[in-house]
Amino acid sequence: MLDILRFDQQPGIAHRLVSASLATSLLCLAACQISPEQPSSAPQASPVPSRAAIAEETVRYQILSDLSDVRFLVFRAGPFAKLGHNHVVQAKNIRGEIRLSSDIRQSSLFIEIPVRDFHIDGEEARLDEGAEFFPQPDDEAIAGTARNMFGERVLDAAQYPTIEIASVALNGPAWGMDVTVRIKFHGVEREIVVPTVVDRNGGKLLVTALFSINQSDFGIVPMSVLGGAIQVANTVRVRMRIVAGRVDAPPQ
């Protein structure tokens, strides 16, 4: 108790001790708020693969025509549609290639289909497509369909002998790409997005797709008879099953 009283009786000493303590606290506070300066580091850019590197990672597949199948499903329409037939038009001698890259966006697809090689209303193909394609038309009806289809009023096969399908952009996973394709058909080009399913099995590549096109988009007026009582529907369903074999030689 006496020591405390003695200390209180010496204000100069107390003032100096309080001032020193306050200064020390301020220094500590300043030291806590200012962190040591860290050397700055610039963000590192991700390496961009060169075209040569992409080419080395690209695998080329040649379309195998004997194993591939492209079908155009053509439907009847109009008030008396039941008097007509639905048709299965199969492409033959399909040509082209697929280049598959580790970077899907660098992949590509090209298909060429000779129009004159179309096979119309094959019995097996119609059976595959189900009840909508029963019954099987007779040979005379099939021949008439072929004449109309290849003629100037529809496909005009003499003037436009091939259909070309080329990829413009590919997006999505390797097993299910959305492929933007440019279709050149009947002298007209149109772009559509085609969802695909892709399966790799050893040295083979299988690409399947189902999509629709409108004849009128390609400058074709769908056929009709009896003042439109029996018509060919404008929309054509396209079913593709493309099988391609790996080509061992590196792409040029």
Identify the function of each model-found stretch.
Residues 1-15:
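N-terminal secretory signal peptides that target proteins for export/translocation
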Residues 13, 17-19, 47:
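Detector for intrinsically disordered, low-structure N-terminal pre-sequences
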Residues 19-30:
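Bacterial N-terminal signal peptides
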Residues 32-252:
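Low-complexity, acidic/polar, glycine-enriched regions of mature
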